Amino acid sequence: MASTADFKNGLVLQIDGQLWSIVEFQHVKPGKGPAFVRTKLKNVLSGKVVDKTYNAGVKVETATVDRRDTTYLYRDGSDFVFMDSQDYEQHPLPESLVGDAARFLLEGMPVQVAFHDGAPLYIELPVTVEIVVTHTEPGLQGDRSSAGTKPATLETGAQINVPLFINTGDKLKVDSRDGGYLGRVNA
């Protein structure tokens, strides 16, 4: 059990038998009336996001989620295989559980896997990922019909928009949460 004062991003709540992760929260104390907490909750299994409001001080059931450091090893058909960094046990996770994170998953990458009651729930990639551009069109100096970006294909097959000066073979820093370009890695 946790009070609304204990809320933080990433805390997993158990509501009506389902697991919900706090994505965003805000304590509100209006001039008139009792204080309350506005939250944005994401269903851990389905990914559905809902808004929920709690009165301040209310106790809420929390779920015990064990986050383990793992290393991504390889893809086996529709499964992604991760190795636990402590006991070296391998965990095959289905593509549905890995979800959108597969866009930036590289072999040997450190990844956190969240478990509840021994079953894997979801994975968390590092916030920034260093990844190589395998294909992009050459950017022309006077080509400014767009906002100065062009599409690029990464070594994982993902496509992102990059500035015009990026070339094939460049190593980039990419935000794994939204696929945004963060910068070029200096060799």
Curated annotation (Swiss-Prot):
This is Elongation factor P. It is found in: Cytoplasm. Keywords: Cytoplasm, Elongation factor, Protein biosynthesis. It comes from the Bacteria. The keyword Cytoplasm applies. The gene is efp. Its main location: cytoplasm. GO terms for biological process: peptide biosynthetic process. It comes from Mycobacterium marinum (strain ATCC BAA-535 / M). GO terms for cellular component: cytoplasm. The keyword Signal does not apply. One of its GO terms (molecular function) is translation elongation factor activity. PROSITE patterns: EFP. Involved in peptide bond synthesis. Stimulates efficient translation and peptide-bond synthesis on native or reconstituted 70S ribosomes in vitro. Probably functions indirectly by altering the affinity of the ribosome for aminoacyl-tRNA, thus increasing their reactivity as acceptors for peptidyl transferase. Pathway: Protein biosynthesis; polypeptide chain elongation. Belongs to the elongation factor P family.
